[in-house]
Swiss-Prot record:
GO terms for cellular component: cytoplasm. The keyword Cytoplasm applies. Gene3D superfamilies: D-tyrosyl-tRNA(Tyr) deacylase. It comes from Lachnospira eligens (strain ATCC 27750 / DSM 3376 / VPI C15-48 / C15-B4) (Eubacterium eligens). Transmembrane segments: none annotated. This is D-aminoacyl-tRNA deacylase. HAMAP family: Deacylase_Dtd.
Length: 148
């Protein structure tokens, strides 16, 4: 699995011009599932993301978690996180998980986040989405299961 995590002041996702997910201060998470990913891997990523101390305290030090700041989550599926650009000029996506499997992992990840975070918004798996955000920092983190 790959996660691109961005600290945001606000973010939203639109499908066909309609806002389907909207958050204030919190995290925008781009979620990608790879061929070898399994549901058993999810708890450690949910725990890591929810506990990461990447929000600033009163001294400007990144010392607070999402829960500490009452932050919100916007989770958007993005298979292109598995783009392989090593050969030629057109990315290959053969390392991305099959749509049915990836969607099941995405939905389970969202459900697990909803157990821990009061406000979790999402895009729609497989849809053409327009994501808007205002980065806070910017502060962006990449988590890759191959490195975890």
């Amino acid at each position: 699995m790959r996660f691109v995590i961005q600290r945001v002041n606000h973010a939203n996702v639109k499908i066909d011009g309609e806002v389907v997910g909207n958050i204030g201060h919190g995290l925008l998470i781009l979620f990608g599932a790879g061929q070898d990913d399994t549901e058993e891997m999810l708890p450690k990523y949910v725990d890591k993301i929810c506990k990461m101390r990447i929000f600033e305290d009163e001294n400007g030090k990144t010392n607070l978690s999402l829960a500490d700041v009452g932050g919100e989550l916007l989770i958007v599926s993005q298979f292109t996180l598995y783009a392989d650009c090593r050969k030629g000029n057109r990315p290959s996506f053969t390392n991305a998980g099959a749509p049915d499997m990836a969607n099941a992992l995405y939905e389970k990840f969202v459900a697990m986040c909803r157990e821990r975070v009061p406000k979790v918004e999402t895009g729609r798996f497989g849809a053409d989405m327009k994501v808007s955000l205002e980065n806070d920092g910017p502060f962006t983190i990449l988590i890759d299961s191959e490195d975890f």
